[in-house]
Amino acid sequence: MRASPRRPTLAAILAAAALVMLGAPGAMGAPGAPGAGAADRVTVGIQLEPPILDPTANPSAAIYQILYGNVFEGLVQFAADGSVLPKLASTWDVTDGGLTYVFHLAPGVRFHDGSPFDAAAAKFSLDRVLAPGSTNPQKSQLAKIRAVEVVDPLTLRVRLVQRSGGLLQSLAWGAFVMVSPGSAAANAVRPVGTGPFRFAEWRRGDSITFVRNADYWGRPAELSEVTFKFISEPTAAYAALMAGDVDAFANYPAPESFAQFAADPRFAVLTGTTEMETVLALNERVAPLGDLRVRRAISYALDRRSIIDGAMFGYGTPIGSHFPPHNPAYLDLTGLYPHDPAKARSLLAAAGYPHGFSVTLKLPPPSYARRSGEIVAAELAQVGIRVRMENLEWAQWLEQVFTRHDFDMSIVGHAEPMDYDIYARDDYYFGYSSVEFKALIAALDDTLDDPGRRELLQKIQRKLAQDAVNGFLFQYPRLDIWNAHLLDLRFDAILGVVDLSRAHFDGGASAGSAGRNGAGLERGARAGMNTASPRPIRFAGALMSAIALILCLLAARRFGAAYLAGRLGVLAATLIAATGIVFIIVQIAPGDPVRYMMGMQADPQSMAATRHQLGLDIAPLPRYLHWVSGLLHGDFGTSFTYRIPVGQLIAERLQVSLPLAALALLLSTAIAFPVALISAARRGRASDAVLTGITQLGLAVPNFWLGMLLVMLFAVDLHWVSAGGFPGWNSGLAAGLGALILPALALAMPQAAILARVLRGALIDTLHEDYIRTARAKGAGEWRVLWRHALPNALVPVLTILGMQFSFLLAGAVIIENVFFLPGLGRLAFQAIVQRDLIVVQSVVVMLVFAVVSVTFLVDLSYVLVNPRLRAEGSA
């Protein structure tokens, strides 16, 4: 039997395509080693994407991390030790016994929109925070302000109802930056500040880019362009650094590999502390934990150093109270409760628990909490306290632990600066109430001089430690990594800011990663929205609509209009049912979206204003009807998180997910069909056994593992492609496909294995049919029999599998999207679920239901086109 000459040609074409996709880094903007692009552009990796870009409306640490000091500035700023320094206010005076603050503003300052920063703008900024409908999460910090007055264009007066010793510290927070009256309403998507960088572009799910502010009132930045890239997965962060896709990573999320970068001369590293106190939170409303002896026993049972070594791989600073070690007022109280299990057992016996007791430890999602929980549970077990661990998602944790106080213990990090005053709140989730502690907080708020405040701060620390309010574990570490040629990149310990105002490359670097991954922002509009081209979506939509129309016309012609109308009716009924089911499930899911958005320190007034703004104060039924009515008009609603239309969000993500799914399906089909045909033709032979074994391996290998392997080989070792990310279709077809080829291949391999096995089985079954024997009797060769007679009759189950695979690949690729940090639909859905962005979850699920039902409908109609027997039945 002579083999078909087409097979080697097909293999050659596939091989050539692979070489073009993987072997032409210049065409796709692939990276080289660190320091291989333009010397005045930098890309910084960060783990979290900011939900909006207005620091005055959301407490997300990611907003402060990238915007504070770079785009926005405040009247004052924090020094590294927590003291207050001038910024937009060059000096200030405190008079009237601490009841009046007069700020003298820096001259010649302008906002990025060209408007002047003066006392009127400063008054607008503070009045906006204090307004009754304000959604500022830290509004309560300025509650003692009675009036804000303009003295002259460069002088601002703030009057208080009573002394506020922490006012200057509060004004240094990111929530109180100065905003332009003319553009403040649009800051959520197009931020306008006074900083050394201007906002340029936000590619949601992928990156945010700033450009140098040439009119900056201070010393201009040396970098012309800065891009912050969102990389949530620790393995992806590692790969992005090693491949040179990013020049730096702020708060590197994988402490287990940090030492490798510290030993690599290509990188510089920094280990420091943050404002986040990691504590074993105790609910003193629960009987055993309300006893001081029990709480002290727990403190003696904890071995902080073992917890740090096991949970944080040795990075972190032991603490003995709720206070950051980098603050000048810090008091080291770790020696108050040394690790002493015998002492712990003695205290438990004295409290009436000689045999210990049982508790539940509810843990939020972060890895530090889960790893610490394992160690804490083991240490408490040594003194007789039996711990049952329960893992929660953030929304569940906020609902059960923080809001309803339904917990015994929890482990969580408190990241807000100067947040020791939370222990003075009786309604706080710890359940701690102390008249003496409240008196200390009141005295601190009434004290203005630094020595007096320092003494009171140390008394506050000692009181919390003596009362063993919580098990104080460690100050969360700050782990930063950057290109060794990148100088003067500063990382703030208090607000977590990545300060790029002085950053620059030394003479040994020819470029930063931004130069490798794109040509800067000479592309696209700088309007602040995602500038990815909608053309691929429009083309795909037009193509799918044309295919659907053709299939519908064929079905109507062969089976009649009644059949087609019936199928369309089933599709419509399914969608209507899906909207109701999805809405109900989302509404009964635990977790308050407003609490998630506003954080643990938000005051009730700001939360109520936000709830009203989002329409969450409306009853469920009217809200459902309003949503469905919008769907009928093509309006999916507005995202709680991003504050933009959900339809726009979905369209942006489909520009990645739809081509990714199509490319993965194309690759899986191109691999599966030859494998199945060869295996079926040579069934029972050695080649069949080898191919069957390969498909079995394809089923067994997880696609995310394969994806990481591909990244390590082609991005980290060979530097042929980027480790991840998506440059946008505006960067060119080659760049877009180059970014999708590895994730598509990782997705395609398991799907190809499934498809090959299904097709092989269908072909073997078909080869026993009478018409196959007839074809052979007429002299047809084996390959002709397979290709012309067996394959068309075996395609029905294959089409079913292909339809299911496309639906899965469209939104089920969330793990691969995280590995390759792609801004796809699956990642959007996952983030929306975690963030309790209900309207996005509802809309994405309904869209996916529509996709699944539509694809299934089209697959059913396509059966008559590929199967000769069905065509004959249709004609009959």
What are these regions (language model features)?
Residues 43, 118-127, 153-157, 195-196, ...:
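Alpha-helical secondary-structure segments
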Residues 45-96, 127, 190-194:
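N-terminal lobe/hinge region of extracytoplasmic solute-binding protein
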Residues 104, 138-181, 201:
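Surface-exposed binding/hinge segments that line
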Residues 164, 169-221, 225, 233-235, ...:
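Gly/Pro-rich hinge or "lid" segments in bacterial periplasmic/extracellular proteins
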Residues 185, 214-259, 377, 386-388:
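Ligand-site clamp/hinge motif
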Residues 203, 301-329, 368-377, 395-527:
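Detector for C-terminal structural segments
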Residues 530-533, 617-673:
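An internal, D/E-rich "acidic patch" concept
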Residues 561-562, 572, 578, 654-687, ...:
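Alpha-helical transmembrane segments of integral membrane proteins
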